[in-house]
Amino acid sequence: MKKAKKRTRTRKGKARKKFKFASRVIVWRAGYNEGVDKGAWRFARVPEDISAKIKAMQKGRLRRGWGAVYAQAKVGKSEWVTSVFPDRHSATYILPLKKQIRYEENLYDGREFNFAIEIWF
């Protein structure tokens, strides 16, 4: 059985676009009882102007599941490979925040932090 290749830190030969923004950490409580959010997803909302640019760059390209767009994200000293997803409740994309990153960078719910993302096409 062959081992799966690890996704590299950069996607060679792909077009890239970098953005910086400030956003609050939001809790996605869908499917959880009110007041019980242990294990609930946390996201940073990409501002509308940047989301509009990402959407325009995606026009005419094949869509991935849920409309996801490959990205490399950075907050503080931490960087990780992820995807940003369109939020159907607003005209923005959302950036998922891994538990490990939240603990390493002390990202608390409702607080605002500075993020950087590099979108890959």
Place the predicted regions along the sequence by residue.
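Long, compositionally biased stretches
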Residues: 2-91, 116
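Short, compact, well-ordered microdomains
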Residues: 81-120
